[in-house]
Amino acid sequence: VTLMNGAFDGSGVLGGYAYVDLIPFVDIEFDFNIQGNTYDIEFQNAFGDMPKINFAWVSGNTYTTVRKKIVGLSIPFLAGAQLHGGLGINTHSTMPVADVKTVERLLGGDLLNADPSSLDKALLDYLEDKENRDDASGFHIQTGLQFKLLMIDTFLIYRHTFADDVIPGASSFGTLNMRLGLGI
């Protein structure tokens, strides 16, 4: 029995963020990311081969954070820098990925001897069904550096996310983000 998924290396990512710093004492930040890639799914067993499927994998997440400046310095109207920390909530939604358990279930529990000739249709139906998406939510903590020069805003943020089922076998994960934007 052979099940092969193409690698997810080189996935494309699109994201955005907005934050409001008009509230005294804290800032509120919202950001989102959408990532995706295409990959080939191939399956073989003693009975035969499944026709190869080219499938698009997509995942999205949102983060809402309340953050507070820890320390900062500025040259009024020209430049500034600050270190901030924050806490927030997040949501994640990912299309399922073809794995051995899924294929085994679609073949009626017999990976070795089941006829895979119609597995491609059943697998596509399963992967495209919104009910099978992997949805998760959790909370996160983050710390970051912000640099401003006139209207140009740059952030370097480390965020640690606590959410089950986003990464198989892990209940948390860290990310490092670099952002560039314009302050309005």
Outline where the language-model segments fall.
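Gram-negative (and chloroplast) outer-membrane scaffold detector with strong preference
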Residues: 17-105
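Membrane-embedded beta-strand positions in outer-membrane beta-barrel channels/transporters
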Residues: 13-17, 61-67, 140-142, 177-179
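Flexible, solvent-exposed loop segments that connect beta-strands
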Residues: 1-6, 35-59, 93-135, 166-170, ...
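Short glycine/proline- and aromatic-enriched beta-strand/turn motifs that initiate or cap beta-hairpins
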Residues: 1-21
